[in-house]
Amino acid sequence: MVELINHGVYLLNGTEIRDNYQGMTPDEARENTITYGILRSHDVDGGKGNKMRIRFDAMMSHDITYVGIIQTARASGLEEFPLPYAMTNCHNSLCAVGGTINEDDHVFGLSAAKKYGGIYVPANQAVIHQYAREMMVKCGNMILGSDSHTRYGSLGNMGVGEGGGELVKQLLKNTWDINAPEVVLVWLEGAPKKGVGPHDVAISLVKATFESGVVKNKVLEFAGPGVKNLPIDFRNGIDIMTTETTCLSSIWVTDEEVKHHYDIHERPQDYRELKPGDVAYYDMMIRIDLSTQESMIALPFHPSNAVTIHELQADPVGILTRIEEDAKKRFGDKVDVHLVDKVVDGKVQADQGIIAGCSGGTYDNLAEAASILKGKNIGNDYFTASAYPQSTPVSMAVTREGITADLIEAGVVMKPAFCGPCFGAGDVPSNNGLSIRHTTRNFPNREGSKPGQGQLSLVALMDARSIAATAANGGVITAATDVEYENTHKPYVYDDKIYKCRVYNGFGKAKPETELRYGPNIKDWPKMYPMQENMLVELAAVIHDPVTTTDELIPSGETSSYRSNPLKLSEFALSRRVPEYVGLSKEIQKQDLARREGNVSENVAEALKAVGATAENTSFGSCVFANRPGDGSAREQAASCQKVLGGDANICYEYATKRYRSNCINWGIVPFTIAKDVEFNYEPGDKVFIPGIREAILAGKEEIDAQVITKEGVKPIHLFFQNLTANERQILADGCLMNYYASSKR
């Protein structure tokens, strides 16, 4: 289904693929990709070098990120939004926990849209990325979003997901600085068989690329004869999931299908044809034969942990036993897992089916699911099913077409445009429950279970079609390719009347006299200190998992209700992975604050004595070690919570994503790495002393000798901090992005 070609290729006239071409060098021909055409047009330097400084055309945020972004920008000198900035309310939109705090955030958002000239999308009107697809994208444009699934390449608009700090830079008319990326040709051939949906293709792509990191920080450019065989919703469903490959962004060729999207959304002027130049070079290629694609299931605890549904059916006990063993390794005695119990008479029984969000809740997905369930029902046993249309226009369309009625008649509960099932704030399964979902992720506990309280539920990702086939079979996991159905629903008809009624669009019409409306949970950022000459950090968490997700660094779900309150939110940092982290970090921070007052603790004094350093010019902070941290969400809180608790550094072998590393930098956390052949067999309580770190960072150095202080003595360690821009170095020296702007008035 998916073939990786790990060498460069030339694409001639958009049709012919060659390994070699004599008329143009790779660097010259790479400029002819769609990717470079868009990136270069957004580079404020206008050059063709290896560095790019990008200004975006528009931005997107949702209600668990925009408050922090605006608070940071305010503290850094914000006066007016200089570009269209849409704020959707699709995460804490149920306002089900924390009393008034969620709606307080929404009220703050509307007041900010009025004051600074923003776009405000009220609760449950649309999930963030569907609103962007409907109202914000333009061919050849770039959108920056404070959500990792900011991907609109299938509509000719490059999307990038980053932490809030990068959006703050754009609000202050600064740039997104990157090295010129490599570009990967994703060549689509054939057409998918009946019953195969976008999630099947996307899961296969993630399976083929994630573990090796082969497309990490590269741009995926989709082309080939198979593109024309995919409707827009199908393309969008693949595109949104490219985030899970750890690629930087994505872009597709555009055609009549894309033109039709802009036409029905009453924006024909925003369409233009995008295609590679006559000779374009790609650094590698992925070939996908759509005709051989099977129905897939991504098992816990990652979208890449995938098999075909037929493979699961052939060996259910063996495959689920391996998942159980993985769960026991991750959670130890905290939870009691019985996944193999889901095998009944040789078949796997799910407890819940969900179709939701930016990937699942499309018109086409819901229409085809309804066709599969037509005349059937989900039964009255333990299996339940819910569907969430991804916007009010989609909800209106499925209602008018009778799709809603068909789903409700089959026993599916219809719910509003809401991202809850994707981040643990809605439809949390029962303990030991197995939920099959057409959503973006199935990370540990992302569905809302709390292992610290003995809870664990499990999520497997499947396409909406196979979820519907499973629902029609009473929850027995079933491939949609194995059922007979006819999809007779009419094409999607878009109606934006509800947006015209409800969405506030104040871009270009800022009202600076407007007072921001604060609830009691909305707090300013605490004071953060500049970097001192030397750095002493104590390990507060040491994680040897292959990958550490941002969901583990700071949980989502109901915890996200506190994202407007930095101190309160930080109490949940690593709570589901390293429960003792917060207490250790607070004690370290307490000792550093005492040191700044001239009261050096015995703990700090002994460590400094061991390395011959003094307390006056040596900061003391906490540090997290993880093998590969930062996979998943763009949430800046994965880093800011560490900083609020006194975190000064991360140490790892590599960062899972650029966006997490950028979050660390913007919050003044030095992103150290160590060589892959170096063992890190230290434990919480051990310390790392980095002499002369401030001077080294400001001088442009990329590595430094440090010392690890353990009970057994002092050991050397060599740390790297590579590929930092001049601005990033100054941000680290100043202590965080806010300090950087405050000190320089940039």
Describe each region flagged by the PLM.
Residues 1-746:
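Fe-S-dependent hydro-lyases/dehydratases of central metabolism
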